[in-house]
């Protein structure tokens, strides 16, 4: 930032002595911005009291204020801006009552902050850096030539102090304004996601990409010119080595190097932080989509069915043919010819027949839960069933039991999108994840 020749106590005493104060409510600030806009259209930069009253009348109309007292309130607003040193009033004895008003540097700075400085332009930044490069190159050449104190003051110190430093401060101000702009974009994105995240996805993507592009353009422009600027500053610094009389130049060069480092490092840091925020927003959207799919799908389906007559819709689904695993070739290889008769215990049984009998038995046992409307804890029932059979049969038994249990009913927790806990069902590490079936 700019250097101050006064100390803190001196500045505090000066502000107290001159009774400095700033109070700008929204109405006053809008009035000041309107005056600045009107001032930009005037070649002489002067405004009469009638012009200011007309501007205030427009502001009052925008804020939906009464029209009866507009003249009195306009006079109070003008006097308030003059008192706060935002406007200068010039009166003449020859033309009494026809005062001329001009914006003060403070008024121009405040209005410029809200109107023009917020307009980021890569071309403007490139021109500023080009001017800085020319000034530093000329100052470096003058420093290497050497000369008396007047030469150093005029050809080295003055360009660095009143041109390069001010442009660095302007770039720094632009970066700080972009910080506020990013915060505003974040508030806009938060508002969009709060209202309706499905409709806001495209708008959020646009805001994220625009801000990312602006930050990248700014950083690319700074990095392209940063090395050359540092090289010229080092040339000037080398020329002042060993010369105590040029300490003021060396101190200024050191401050400029610190400003340039801060400007370039800010650009990369801002990009890194924005990338993190971009990922956070996308993660939030993905999480919202997943939660909506699991939690609100049933509710939206019911609403769609209920409102079908008002808003007809069509359901498209895939009905592909099932793929059957045919093992005839393997069975033919195992079909060895045998002689004699087998005992009944060794007679071959088709797996499908065995499975049907087991399924019928399990279905009969599970019907008790449905008849008595008792909750069916699938994990507990699986543990009890699997304890009756050897380990080799656990997988087949668990599959049959789960199929039969699912046919009986559903779990209320499934509609709420809640994730079930894993439960152990045997002593060999097998687990199942299922809610208690409570609706048949």
From Swiss-Prot:
Residues 208-236 are annotated as: Leucine-zipper. GO terms for cellular component: cytoplasm; nucleoid. It comes from the Bacteria. Keywords: Calcium, Cell cycle, Cell division, Chromosome partition, Cytoplasm, DNA condensation. Gene3D superfamilies: Chromosome partition protein MukF, middle domain, MukF, C-terminal domain, Winged helix-like DNA-binding domain superfamily/Winged helix DNA-binding domain. It is found in: Cytoplasm, Nucleoid. InterPro entries: Chromosome_partition_MukF (IPR005582), MukF_C (IPR033441), MukF_C_sf (IPR038198), MukF_M (IPR033440), MukF_M_sp (IPR036141), MukF_WHTH (IPR033439), WH-like_DNA-bd_sf (IPR036388), WH_DNA-bd_sf (IPR036390). It holds the Pfam family MukF_C. One of its GO terms (biological process) is chromosome condensation. One of its GO terms (molecular function) is calcium ion binding. Involved in chromosome condensation, segregation and cell cycle progression. May participate in facilitating chromosome segregation by condensation DNA from both sides of a centrally located replisome during cell division. Not required for mini-F plasmid partitioning. Probably acts via its interaction with MukB and MukE. Overexpression results in anucleate cells. It has a calcium binding activity. Belongs to the MukF family. Interacts, and probably forms a ternary complex, with MukE and MukB via its C-terminal region. The complex formation is stimulated by calcium or magnesium. It is required for an interaction between MukE and MukB. NCBIfam families: PRK05260.1. This is Chromosome partition protein MukF. It comes from Edwardsiella ictaluri (strain 93-146). The gene is mukF.
């Amino acid at each position: 930032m700019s250097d101050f020749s006064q100390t803190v106590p001196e500045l505090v005493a000066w502000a107290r002595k001159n009774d400095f104060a700033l109070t700008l409510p929204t109405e006053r600030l809008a009035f000041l911005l309107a005056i600045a806009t009107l001032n930009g259209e005037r070649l002489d930069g002067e405004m009469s009291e009638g012009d200011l009253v007309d501007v205030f009348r427009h502001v009052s109309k925008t804020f939906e204020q009464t029209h009866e007292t507009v003249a009195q309130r306009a006079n109070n607003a003008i006097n308030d801006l003059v008192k706060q040193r935002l406007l200068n009033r010039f009166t003449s004895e020859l033309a009494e009552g026809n005062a001329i008003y001009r914006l003060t540097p403070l008024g121009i700075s405040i209005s410029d902050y809200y109107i023009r400085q917020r307009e980021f332009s890569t071309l403007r930044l490139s021109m500023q850096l080009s001017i800085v490069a020319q000034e530093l190159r000329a100052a470096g050449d003058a420093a290497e030539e050497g000369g008396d104190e007047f030469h150093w003051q005029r050809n080295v110190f003055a360009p660095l102090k009143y041109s390069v430093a001010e442009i660095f401060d302007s770039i720094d101000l632009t970066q700080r304004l972009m910080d506020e702009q990013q915060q505003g974009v974040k508030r806009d994105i938060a508002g969009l996601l709060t209202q309706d995240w499905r409709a806001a996805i495209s708008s959020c993507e646009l805001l994220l990409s625009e801000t990312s592009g602006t930050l990248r353009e700014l950083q690319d422009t700074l990095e392209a010119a940063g090395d050359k600027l540092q090289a010229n500053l080092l040339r000037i610094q080398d020329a002042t080595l060993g010369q105590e009389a040029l300490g003021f130049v060396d101190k200024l060069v050191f401050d400029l190097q610190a400003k340039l480092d801060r400007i370039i490092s800010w650009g990369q840091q801002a990009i890194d932080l924005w990338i993190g925020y971009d990922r956070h927003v996308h993660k939030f959207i993905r999480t919202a989509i997943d939660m909506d799919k699991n939690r609100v799908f049933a509710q939206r389906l019911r609403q769609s069915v209920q409102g079908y007559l008002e808003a007809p819709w069509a359901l498209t689904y895939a009905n592909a043919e099932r793929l059957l695993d045919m093992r005839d070739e393997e069975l033919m290889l195992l079909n060895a010819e045998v002689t004699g008769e087998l005992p009944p215990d060794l007679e071959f049984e088709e797996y499908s027949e065995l499975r049907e009998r087991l399924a019928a038995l399990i279905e009969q046992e599970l019907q008790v839960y449905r008849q008595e409307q008792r909750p069916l804890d699938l994990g507990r029932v699986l543990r009890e069933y699997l304890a009756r059979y050897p380990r080799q049969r656990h997988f087949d038994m668990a599959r049959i039991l789960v199929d039969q249990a699912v046919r009986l009913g559903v779990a209320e927790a499934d509609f709420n999108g809640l994730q079930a806990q894993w439960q152990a069902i045997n002593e060999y590490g097998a687990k199942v994840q299922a809610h208690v079936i409570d609706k048949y």
